Amino acid sequence: MPKFMLLQNYTPIEGVEPISSWAPEDINAHVAFQLALNNELVASGEFVDGQGLAGPELAKFVTFDGVGAPVVTDGPFPEAKELLAGYRIVDVESEARAVEIAAKTSAAPGPGGAPIRQPIEVRQVMGAPTPEL
């Protein structure tokens, strides 16, 4: 079965305040939704991994030319249009099933329980290169 990564980005969503400004009960409902979805995917045998990530203010970009010391730049990165907020990896029968899970993820509750319509990027996991390459 193919694996897909469902990527959630810190992308402004029209009409939805950033989660840092949500009421505690709205944050709790959002997290509970994500955990329930993970549990549903575990029960169906489709869940591989999923994690929420620390905010962009804690991120670091690292570049290295192979000589000397790497260059480390601390976040946040206002010039970046999208920064990864979290992901799920699912092992599903088809891309259509991955899209179905992404749609459910997109409808996670936000302030007042309204679906936030967060864009979810769906990408097939291709696996590691084989020695024949």
Which residues does each PLM region occupy?
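Conserved, structured core segments of small domains
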Residues: M1-L133
